[in-house]
Amino acid sequence: YLNDIVNAKIKCSYCLTEPSAGSDANSGKSKAIFSEDKKHFILNGQKMWITNSGFADVFFVFCKIENDENLSCLIVHKEWGVKLGAEENKLGIHGSSTRQVFFENVKVPVENLLGERNKGFKIAMNALNAGRIKIGVANTAIGKRAFKLGVNYANEREQFGEKIANFGAIQEKIAQMATQ
């Protein structure tokens, strides 16, 4: 899978959040049980707020296997019966698709267990931590750009014959932007 992902031959989606679990990912209800021949998992569950789900070919699904206490991760192909909810109407990040994802008796080969059984939570957290760093960097850049635009605007806009950058209220707002 890695070669196809890196070379953009397949698109992926990361399925962790569930309606009843929220931030406590390990309390999710999605579950996989072994098929009678033990060659497949039968996956059932629901995920929500799943980024890229509308155009993903493959889903990394965090679920419990049988009666395990901890999550595992299964690699699930869309064509195996994954169903998608309606597109979420988001305030921002319009370049990605965000939907609910449903698994109803989806048959997944046992070879598609990513890593070790019961070790999915560590996989999930490692992926989230990398994303958190990127989001922090992006938000810092957005803040710097907003500050620069605000200062430029305050130095260009005039009211009552004076640049608004000279008004105390505007200076206070700019100072707050610079320090926060």
Predicted regions and their residues:
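Glycine-rich beta->alpha junctions and the first turn(s) of the following alpha-helix
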Residues: V82-Q180
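A short, Trp-centered hydrophobic/proline-enriched beta-strand micro-motif
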Residues: A8-L16
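Active-site-adjacent elements of ketosynthase-type condensing enzymes
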Residues: P19-K29
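Glycine-rich phosphate/pyrophosphate-binding beta-alpha loops
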Residues: A21, M48-G54, I93, A130
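A short core secondary-structure module
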Residues: H40-L84
